[in-house]
From Swiss-Prot:
It comes from Baboon endogenous virus (strain M7). GO terms for biological process: DNA integration; DNA recombination; establishment of integrated proviral latency; proteolysis; symbiont entry into host cell; viral genome integration into host DNA; virion assembly. The RT polymerase active site binds 2 magnesium ions. Binds 1 magnesium ion for ribonuclease H (RNase H) activity. A lipid is attached at residue 2 (N-myristoyl glycine). Mg(2+) 1 binds at residues 806, 880-881. The record marks 129-130, 226-227, 477-478, 533-534, 658-659, 1335-1336 as: Cleavage. This is Gag-Pol polyprotein. Residues 560-630 form the Peptidase A2 domain. The active site is at 565 (protease). The keyword Transmembrane helix does not apply. The keyword Membrane applies. Residues 1438-1596 form the Integrase catalytic domain. Residues 166-187 have a biased composition (Low complexity). A motif (PPXY motif) lies at residues 154-157.
Length: 1727
């Protein structure tokens, strides 16, 4: 029988309709919300024992009623209706309340289970009734009470210990009867049961119903409230039912989501149900996961109380108090019940301990008050957050201040402002804060009030606008009427005066004008032409004929002339002329936004046909409009010609003769949706296709909640500018999504930009949202999307019928939770639809990083039933791409039908355009599948084939990535692409050479001939043929198809640097391990046979120990010696892998063990034992130690008695490096001799014998591809090994005692090396007496000898060297090498390097020339040194008269005043006249405004304007204005202020003058002083003695007249004389100035030519970046600037310098200029 939790409150809420009816009968009204609030919140606070879940105890109800109806100030009149209704439910209980009421024991019958007769055996338990039966029993009339049975007494609620009851004596004692559920011995009498309603229960107990069979009557139902209790010292036990466990599991959050809620639930279960140890285990098993259960048990064992009540640490006490295995507790005894109580106590402590999460205050700060959330609910949610994410109790007094501050800071804005203004906020408790917040919350306006307020404000704004407009119209009308009246009066403005008895018409006396017989009676006054606002029908809006093009139609029988307006979406009438419909629309016009109504459908006569149409009524519209809606029905065409616009139909005829049917005949001409599917598929499954079923929505998926990272804060990025074409392109998609509900308006602190992406090959745009910032702030989930590389491996090759479905708008099928929708908001403005604000997605958006994984998992769950019900087909899913494969066409058809049915029922939609139904050849994931084989699509091959040669490392990586997708079809891909891998690094110079071009073309050629590969069949074994060449592993994965081996994949990979340095027989082992690991993605664990040209298995089992490390060997053996999966075939020299193209011939068969045994180091005759006939025996050693924080190092070579060589090494040299140096020096000194050399360094010994050759083979790289340590010393050692005639390098133990020669020599070498390390200068070598001094003999050419003689040097006959003054003259070749080495060490300049060479013992002829040659060729120095090209001063281009050529610039003036920061300065280059305007901003709008409003009206239209490259000058606004006006806007070279020298100098002059004036006057407003500064600038003489004022106006400067007294004659100069003076100025001043300003011949001031390599200055270098970047190739030149490849702007010649010549194609040949097909382009080529 199912167990349910029923309380009085939940019972009344379930039957609230009956409660409301009963209250109505009592003449009161109750509401459900208040009923629940009073019962659970208000009445428990009255302290009368009212439980939160309600009670049917009449005494408690009466106490609450007394409190509520208290006449004093503490009464609650609003709760009277509810408590009297509750009282009536108890006094007059309905059927659904009676089973829960206790009837006082007034009858002889008591509550007792019926006895089982002694002569009857106990029947088996009856079957448990379903929940429906239980509910039916609740509504039946109560059965007569059986005799009282003490088993049915409920336990107390406050403690799980045995109850202490106050028995009520029954009127009639019950007979003693044995119970069937307890022991046979029962006391003769039992007390009456207490009342069933507890006084203050912690939780209402679950209701249990059980049926027992009476002695002589039918079975009756009895209620038992608890499963485990003490009755006559016997325990009654009822286990948990499946329905209880299911309800607890389903209707409560998991422990990981909300540990507090689940802990409270388990706590209530432990208190009310009193479970046993087994019940607790079952409860934990159902409600917790395995990991959560382990944590709870671990925490519980930490809280087992000891004898003193504190947690114990003794294992025996812990095991006794909280056993992990089932204990043998006897619950009928007090110790057993006490043990169970301790167990429950520890278990509850463990739940609370395990539920504590790590402290994360950031999570608490994210809890903010919702828009419509009450303060009490928000406080409860905040307290729950503190309990969940912090270790302290938020209700503790010491933490209330923290909670209060969080409540205030994270509350809504209006509540937060109110609480922050409270006085003494620290003294307020949490309840007081909630109470204050409730006051603000309750004062908020309701949505209805807010809407009414907005409507009222809108009406007030419209009234104000109408009154203002009427006021203006009244003024206009008054002015017009006054003018008319004045015009009618003719010449006499006033009428003649008329006497009292005189006629105003005929001027005769005796009658008035109304009785005048001469006045015509029937003449009508002509209607005046009224103006706007006059009250006349002819003058009303819309009365006149509209302009062309117009069209007259009959609307509802009334002829109406329409203005054809293609910009109007709907047709408009100015008058209703009939009834209006209830339909309204908002209309956005020039005067604002108003709501207008629509007419009912009117009949429109088109001449020969009738249509019905509904018009929008807009009285403010000047004319009736014929909009696009009616034009679309008419199929109208508008043609514009010189005669005017014509409205014609499709055939070119006037629109009046067009007939349109009543049923909108235009729909017949619509192009139907074309699909490649038969109609039967669309008709049978309309809900499965996007074309017929619309947008889908997953029916079985809950809304998705997006989790944010703990530190995530909202990000708001403004919308990028968007072109009109792009905006209109994505507008249709936005409108569609709004109509479908995929988008909705919102207000969100989050905002990301929307990007319009043009679809390739079309003019359509699609909206793409930039969600990169959102992706950074959301929690990452593990991607479960399948790998397309091995997805098809699960497809059986014999399944040759396929169906491919592509789900349409797949991500939009999954809804987003409302709390996650605001994350994806973006800006959108659409004035036509009245949208200006933010929109957000209600479905899962595209571009979100977790969308593919979330959708893939959701679709996989929804298709689980299909996979299990149809095992005869295979269904592959890659996100929204589905592939169904079947062995026959019939099976494929049936599977497809079931799949479409399943998709339609689950709410997904497939694209009919892209569907491939029941075909033998389909395209899926870029592959073509047919007959169990796959190959690349032509489109993918063409994409790779069209890729041009790369120009930088990024493009090389892009090409390799695109081609790498097809590597399974390219035999030997890694070998073909090997030359290109070196160009992928950014650190290496990019040089595209012939070998790279050949590799690039070879990959394309191999792709064009890509073969078809078979699909892997996981039911068959695989064979892998392997070979290795030049560090490239190549393989062919095959499967048997009859007698043939069909290729499944071509594999190739490059070995790592370590394995590449091994001998060939070991490289094959590394190659095999790499390809076996890669092939596992396709074989999926099936048996694999490996066949190679080597005896691979023997090498893997017993490899040589000198080549490979133990870790790598263990990895190889674990991978290759797995006999269950990998088998080795016999060595085969010719196999598919060895037949792949290689650049060298095939090797002959060999024995791998013998080859490895014969593999030697660098020198074949190098010995590790003493030579018997050695010329000398030397001992080497290196020393390195710390001395006062400095590492000192030295090296030495000794012979046991004398020091052969010793030297101190630079500080910081390691001991290994010193050992290598010492051994290398000993080998160099043994050149041409037989030598025994001892060393105690294992590192030096192994490097010379073994490791050196390995390093050399793998390019001196480590396993990570980095350079090895001591690379230069190892190279020197490997070279020095070949200098002696014979040599033996012997290892000896270090620091040995004894007198044998080896120990003595080793100790001497160690002592001398240590002494050398302590020396600060070089210790020269001391040769023994019997050893001659070694002298280097230089080789001189005839040119070297001539130069030596020229400087006075002589030849030394002994050394055969040329010497002068004790210095050796170096040959030119050796001198050049020496200078290069010294410059590489120091990078000194010419002068410093020459001084350094002069201090050496060598003399170099022509040293200055060689030094200059070396320094100029150093690329590093050219990039870093500050030297630049010096160009001579030139002439700037100026105008030939004033106002023609202007220079313009912005300059900032500090301090700012009144928001004005900048000064826009114009300088006329001819006269020097200056105009300056203060501005607040530095924008292109200001520049265009000043040109149009200031320069153009006063000085005429400029021809040329020069400026720098500031944003205000290069913007589209400025450049567009110049293009429209025909102005040549010249942008000067970047970072070259000399190009704008005139305006730059004027900026300085103006600011200097302003500074002086501010100091003199004390004014801070520099704008008031600007006119004086301009006065000085305009009257300052130039180098020709003329002021700008004189050049412009032809008169003396106004400053000269200030010194003279005023004379009236000075201002009476004849105008003609002035004009003649201006003419003379133009002839005598303007012409000579123009001649002086002429630039003359344009001579090139720099040495750069087209095709040269130059470095370009980096103007803003950061950190340690070089000062110069490049080199670049010069494409174009001018006399002062150059244009280089790779930089868009022109570069001034002073910002470039020549790069040192490098050999290659750019160093020879000439450039030739050719024309191209495009007249705006030229072609450069080298010959």
């Amino acid at each position: 029988m199912g167990q349910t939790l029923t309380t009085p409150l939940s019972l009344t809420l379930t039957h609230f309709s009956d409660v409301r009816a009963r209250a109505h009968n009592l003449s009161v009204g109750v509401r459900k919300g208040r009923w629940q609030t009073f019962c659970s919140s208000e009445w428990p606070t009255l302290h009368v024992g009212w439980p939160r879940d309600g009670t049917f105890d009449l005494s408690v109800i009466l106490q609450v009623k007394t409190k509520v109806m208290d006449p004093g100030p503490h009464g609650h009149p609003d709760q009277v209706a509810y408590i009297i209704t509750w009282e009536d439910l108890v006094r007059n209980p309905p059927p659904w309340v009676k089973p829960f009421l206790h009837t006082p024991s007034t009858s002889k019958s008591t509550l007792l289970a019926l006895e089982v007769p002694k002569n009857r055996t106990l029947d088996p338990p009856k079957p448990v009734l379903p929940d429906e039966s239980q509910q039916d029993l609740l509504f039946q009339d109560p059965l007569p009470h059986p005799p009282h049975n003490p088993l049915l007494e409920p336990p107390p609620y406050n403690s799980p210990s045995p109850p202490v009851l106050s028995p009520v004596s029954p009127t009639t004692p019950s007979a003693p009867t044995p119970s069937s559920l307890v022991s046979s011995s029962t006391p003769p009498s039992s007390p009456a049961p207490p009342e069933l309603t507890p006084r203050t229960p912690p939780q209402t107990p679950r209701l249990r119903l059980r049926r027992a069979e009476g002695q002589d009557g039918p079975s009756t139902w009895q209620s038992s409230l608890f499963p485990l209790r003490t009755v006559n010292r016997t325990i009654q036990y009822w286990p948990f039912s499946a329905s209880d466990l299911y309800n607890w599991k389903t209707h409560n959050p998991s422990f990981s989501q909300d540990p507090q809620a689940l802990t409270s639930l388990i706590e209530s279960i432990l208190l009310t149900h009193q479970p046993t140890w087994d019940d607790c285990q079952q409860l934990l098993q159902v409600l917790l996961t395995t990991e959560e259960r382990q944590r709870v048990l671990l925490e519980a064992r930490k809280n087992v109380p000891g004898p003193g009540g504190l947690p114990t640490q003794l294992p025996n006490e812990i095991d006794e108090g909280f056993p992990l295995t089932r204990p043998d507790w006897d619950y009928e005894t007090a110790p057993g019940r006490e043990s169970l109580r301790i167990y429950r106590q520890a278990l509850l402590a463990g739940l609370k301990g395990a539920g504590k999460r790590p402290t994360n205050l950031a999570k608490v700060r994210t809890i903010t008050q919702g828009k419509d959330e009450s303060p009490a609910a928000f406080m409860e949610r905040l307290l729950e957050g503190f309990r969940m994410y912090t270790p302290f109790d938020p209700e503790a007094p010491e933490h209330k201040a923290t909670v209060a501050m969080s409540f205030i800071d994270q509350a809504a804005l209006d509540i937060k402002g109110k609480l922050q203004r409270l006085d003494g906020i620290q003294t307020h408790g949490l309840q007081e804060l909630v109470r204050e917040a409730e006051k603000v919350y309750n004062k908020r306006e309701t949505p209805e009030e807010r809407e009414a307020r907005l409507i009222k404000e809108q009406e007030e704004r419209e009234d104000r606008r109408d009154r203002k407009r009427d006021k203006h119209l009244t003024k206009i009308l008054a002015a017009v009427v006054t003018e008319k009246r004045a015009g009618k009066s003719g010449e006499t403005r006033r009428r003649p005066k008329v006497d009292k008895d005189q006629c105003a018409y005929c001027k005769e006396r005796g009658h008035w004008i109304k009785d005048c017989p001469k006045r015509p009676r029937d003449q009508k006054k002509p209607a005046p032409v009224l103006t706007l606002g006059e009250d006349s029908e002819q003058g009303c809006q819309g009365s006149g004929a509209p302009p062309e093009p117009r069209l007259t139609l009959s609307v509802g029988g009334h002829p109406t002339t329409f203005l054809v307006d293609t910009g109007a979406q709907h047709s408009v009438l100015t008058k209703a002329n009939g009834p209006l419909s209830s339909r309204t629309s908002w209309v956005q016009g020039a005067t604002g936004r108003k709501m207008h109504k629509w007419t009912n459908r009117r009949t429109v006569n088109l001449g020969q046909g009738m249509v019905t149409h509904s018009f929008l009524v807009v009285p403010e519209c000047p004319y009736p409009l014929l909009g696009r809606d009616l034009l679309t029905k008419l199929g109208a065409q508008i043609h514009f010609s010189e005669a005017g616009a014509q409205v014609l139909d499709r055939d070119g005829q006037p629109i009046q003769i067009l007939t349109v049917s009543l049923q909108d005949e235009h729909r017949l001409f619509d192009i139907p949706v074309t699909t490649s599917l038969p109609d039967v598929w669309l008709q049978d499954f309309p809900q499965a296709w996007a074309e017929t079923g619309g947008l889908g929505r997953a029916k079985c998926q809950a809304p998705i909640i997006i989790d944010l990272k703990p530190t995530a804060v909202p990000v708001s990025i403004k919308q990028y500018p968007m072109s009109l074409e792009a905006h209109m392109g994505i507008r249709q998609h936005i409108i569609k999504f709004l109509e479908l509900g995929v988008l909705r308006p919102c207000r969100s602190p989050w905002n990301t930009p929307l990007l319009p992406v043009k679809k390739p090959g079309t003019q359509d745009y699609r909206p793409v949202q930039d969600l990169r910032e959102i992706n950074k702030r959301t929690v990452d989930i593990h991607p479960t999307v399948p790998n397309p590389y091995n997805l098809l491996s699960t497809l059986k090759p014999d399944y040759s019928w396929y169906t491919v479905l592509d789900l349409k708008d797949a991500f939009f099928c999954l809804p987003l939770a409302p709390q996650s929708q605001e994350l994806f908001a973006f800006e959108w403005k659409d004035p036509e639809r009245g949208i200006s604000g933010q929109l957000t997605w209600t479905r899962l958006p595209q571009g979100f990083k977790n969308s593919p994984t979330l959708f893939d998992e959701a679709l996989h769950r929804d298709l689980t039933d299909f996979r299990t019900q149809h095992p005869e087909v295979t269904l592959l899913q890659y996100v929204d791409d589905l592939l169904l494969a079947a062995p026959t066409k019939k099976a494929c058809t049936q599977g497809t039908r079931h799949l479409l049915q399943e998709l339609g029922e689950k709410g997904y939609r497939a694209s009919a355009k892209k569907a491939q139904i029941c075909q033998t050849k389909v395209t899926y994931l870029g592959y073509i599948l047919s007959e169990g084989k796959r190959w690349l699509t032509p489109g993918r091959i063409e994409t790779v084939a069209r890729i041009p040669p790369p120009r930088n490392p990024r493009e090389v990586r892009e090409f390799l990535g695109t081609a790498g997708f097809c590597r399974l079809w390219i035999p030997g891909f890694a070998e073909l692409a090997a030359p290109l891998y070196a160009l992928t690094k950014e650190s290496t110079p990019f040089t595209w050479q012939t070998e790279h071009q050949l590799a690039f073309e070879a990959l394309k050629k191999a792709l064009l001939s890509a073969p078809a590969l078979g699909l892997p069949d996981t039911s068959k074994p695989f064979t892998l043929f392997l070979d290795e060449r030049q560090g490239i592993a190549k393989g062919v994965l095959t499967q048997k198809l009859g007698p043939w081996k069909r290729p499944v994949a071509y594999l190739s990979k490059k070995l790592d640097p370590v394995a590449a340095g091994w001998p060939p027989c070991l490289r094959i082992m590394a190659a095999t391990a790499m390809l076996v690991k890669d092939s596992a993605k396709l074989t999926l664990g099936q048996p694999l046979t490996v066949i190679t040209p080597h005896t691979l298995e023997a090498i893997v089992r017993q490899p040589p120990d000198r080549w490979i490390t133990n870790a790598r060997l263990t990895h190889y053996q674990a991978l290759l010696l797995d006999t269950d999966r990998v088998q080795f075939g016999p060595p085969v020299t010719l196999n598919p892998a060895t037949l792949l193209p290689v650049p060298e011939n095939q090797p002959s068969p060999h024995d791998c063990r013998q080859v490895l045994a014969e593999t030697h180091g660098t020198r074949e005759d190098l010995k590790d034992q003493e030579l018997p006939d050695a010329d000398h025996t030397w001992y080497t050693d290196g020393s390195s130690y710390l001395d006062s924080g400095t590492r000192r190092a030295g090296a030495a070579v000794v012979d046991g008695h004398n020091t052969i060589w010793a030297q101190s090494l630079p500080p910081g040299t390691s001991a290994q490096k010193a050992e290598l140096i010492a051994l290398t020096k000993a080998l160099e000194l043994s050149k041409g001799k037989k030598a025994n050399i001892y060393t105690d360094s294992r590192y030096a010994f192994a490097t010379a014998h073994t490791h050196g050759s390995i390093y050399e083979r793998r390019g001196l790289l480590t396993s990570e591809g980095k350079e090895i340590k001591n690379k230069a010393e190892i190279i020197a050692l490997l070279k020095a090994l070949f200098l002696p005639q014979e040599v033996a390098i012997i290892h000896c133990p270090g620091h040995q005692k004894g007198q044998d020669p080896v120990a003595v020599g080793n100790r001497q070498a160690d002592r001398v090396a240590r002494q050398a390390a302590m020396a600060e200068v070089l210790t020269l070598a001391t040769e023994p007496d019997n050893t001659s001094h070694i002298t280097i003999e230089h080789t001189y050419t005839s040119e070297d000898q001539e130069e030596a003689r020229a400087i006075g040097a002589t030849e030394n006959k002994d050394t055969r060297n040329w010497e002068k003054e004790g210095k050796i003259v170096l040959p030119q070749k050796e001198a050049l090498a020496m200078i290069q080495q010294m410059h590489a060490w120091t990078h000194l300049g010419n002068r410093k390097l020459k001084l350094l060479i002069e201090k050496t013992d060598f003399l170099i002829p022509r040293a200055s020339t060689l030094i200059e040659q070396v320094t100029s060729a150093c690329k590093v120095c050219q990039q870093v040194n500050a030297g630049a090209t010096r160009v001579p001063a030139g002439k700037r281009t100026r105008g030939n008269r004033p106002g023609v050529y202007w220079e313009i610039d912005f300059t900032e003036v500090k301090p700012h005043y009144a928001g004005y920061k900048y000064l826009l300065v114009f300088v006329d280059t001819f006269s020097g006249w200056v105009e300056a305007f203060p501005t607040r901003q530095e924008t292109a709008h200001i520049v265009a405004k000043k040109i149009l409003e200031e320069i153009f009206p006063r000085f005429g239209l400029p021809k040329v304007i020069g400026s720098d490259n500031g944003p205000a000058f290069v913007s589209q606004v400025s450049q567009g204005l110049a293009r429209i006006l025909g102005i040549n806007w010249k942008l000067h070279c970047a970072y070259r202020p000399q190009s704008s020298g005139q305006v730059e100098r004027m900026n300085r002059t103006i600011k200097e003058t302003l500074t002086k004036l501010t100091l003199e006057t004390g004014l801070k407003d520099w704008r008031r002083l600007l006119s004086l500064a301009l006065l000085r600038a305009r009257n300052t003489p130039n180098r020709f003695g003329l002021t700008p004022y004189e050049i412009l106006y032809g008169g003396p400067p106004p400053l000269s007249t200030l010194l003279n007294s005023f004379s009236p004659s000075n201002s009476k100069t004849d105008l003609q004389a002035r004009l003649k003076g201006l003419q003379a100025v133009q002839a005598q001043i303007w012409a000579p100035l123009a001649e002086l300003y002429r630039p003359g011949h344009s001579q090139t001031s720099h040495p750069f030519q087209v095709g040269d390599s130059v470095y370009v200055r980096r103007h803003r270098s950061q950190g340690l970046e070089p000062r110069w970047k490049g080199p670049y190739i010069v494409l174009l030149t001018t006399p002062t600037a150059i244009k280089v490849d790779g930089i868009a702007t022109w570069i001034h010649a002073s910002h470039a310098k020549a790069a040192p010549g490098t050999p290659g194609p750019t160093s020879s040949g000439t450039w030739r200029l050719r024309r191209s097909e495009d007249p705006l382009k030229i072609r450069l080529s080298r010959t």
